[in-house]
């Protein structure tokens, strides 16, 4: 199989169809496009949980680098952020994390300390407690593997965690812990697509890009990681009555749109020209022969709502760029409109980051 998430048909056939045991306490569980699971054990606050894992590819000697991480796809802080983003897309704010590290035999203690130092720095920023985990050395792995399990509580209507049963929690039988996309709803996207992948490309191809573009463009793109949190827009969206949310990440915006629609059994009509792109992403993707619509898009939140203009206005009032890009339809067709051209959206493919990495090997 190709590197990255398994194809959707494999996920459905060999993973989801094998899950047969159901419990009433699990009010939102495994499924296509689900960002997190939600549990309800009592009439009090429901518990949100999700898991993120990554193979870490440190560059050079960890002892010399200290906590300076350089990975083609992820850092310890980004791993924590991705977990928090998934919970936010489900309607919850992360409050605790469990971290598991599986490390090769040659790992030095300085490596572990550097990982935990950066992870703790991100958790401090997010007001998240590292509540436990496991650190194990194994000769079964060649590269460090990290797994983060995040735990969260529902956003309150003021954007803060709620201290009791919430309307959000009561709706979690539907998609994304908020609700199912419904016919006629507006599809809204926050910030810009391809941010995460653009930052990686800018760092990994700096010399090549500098032969073509000014340094300020490449440097700005490399700093796009500052946009990766979707917690602010998710909190604002909950206050504004959003119906469904999905965190765009691996597979790009096309993958996120497909998963949101597939999980709810609805169709979409999306205007390609309205999908928000930074000029840095356009230029760098052209130079690197990458499709920006299928590129890592962490930092971009896909939402559906009855009142698209109202949600956009609410987000923009908080300084968060947002735009209406399409509509939810009553068919299973996911259509991309580009002026006079109409085509059907493909099932999610291997993310462009993994594709170009494989081609260069």
Annotate each predicted stretch with a short phrase.
Residues 5-189, 194-195:
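Glycine-rich phosphate/pyrophosphate-binding loop regions near the starts of catalytic domains
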Residues 29-31, 39-43, 123, 138-143, ...:
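Solvent-exposed alpha-helices and their adjacent loops that cap or buttress functional pockets
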Residues 104-106, 221-297:
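Active-site-proximal betaalpha loop/short-helix elements
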Residues 304-310:
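Helix N-cap motif at beta-to-alpha junctions
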């Amino acid at each position: 199989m190709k590197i990255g998430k398994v194809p959707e048909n494999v996920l459905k056939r060999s993973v989801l169809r094998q899950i047969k045991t159901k419990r009433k306490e699990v009010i939102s569980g495994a499924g296509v496009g689900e960002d997190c699971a939600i549990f309800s054990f009592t009439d009090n606050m429901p518990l949100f949980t999700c898991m993120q894992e990554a193979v870490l590819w440190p560059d050079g000697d960890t002892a010399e680098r200290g906590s300076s991480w350089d990975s083609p796809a992820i850092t310890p802080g980004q791993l924590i952020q991705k977990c928090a983003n998934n919970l936010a897309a489900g309607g919850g704010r992360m409050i605790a994390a469990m971290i598991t590290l599986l490390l090769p035999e040659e790992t030095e203690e300085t490596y572990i300390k550097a990982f935990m130092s950066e992870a703790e720095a991100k958790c401090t920023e997010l007001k998240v407690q590292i509540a436990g985990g496991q650190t194990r050395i194994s000769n079964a792995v060649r590269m460090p593997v990290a797994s983060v399990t995040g735990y969260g509580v529902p956003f309150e209507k003021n954007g803060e965690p709620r201290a009791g049963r919430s309307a959000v929690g009561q709706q979690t039988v539907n998609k994304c812990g908020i609700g199912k996309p419904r016919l006629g709803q507006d599809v809204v996207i926050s910030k810009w697509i391809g941010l995460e992948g653009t930052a990686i490309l800018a760092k990994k191809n700096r010399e090549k890009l500098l032969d073509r573009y000014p340094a300020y463009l490449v440097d700005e793109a490399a700093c796009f990681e500052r946009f990766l949190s979707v917690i602010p827009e998710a909190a604002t969206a909950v206050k504004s009555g959003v119906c469904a949310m999905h965190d765009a990440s691996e597979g790009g915006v096309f993958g996120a749109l497909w998963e949101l629609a597939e999980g709810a059994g609805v169709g979409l009509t999306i205007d390609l020209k309205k999908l928000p792109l930074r000029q840095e992403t356009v230029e760098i993707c052209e130079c690197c022969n990458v499709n920006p619509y299928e590129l890592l898009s962490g930092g971009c939140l896909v939402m559906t709502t009855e009142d698209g203009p109202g949600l956009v206005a609410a987000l923009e009032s908080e300084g968060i760029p947002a735009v209406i890009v399409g509509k939810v339809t009553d068919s299973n067709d996911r259509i991309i409109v580009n002026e006079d051209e109409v085509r059907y959206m493909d099932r999610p493919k291997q993310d462009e980051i993994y594709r170009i990495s494989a081609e260069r090997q």
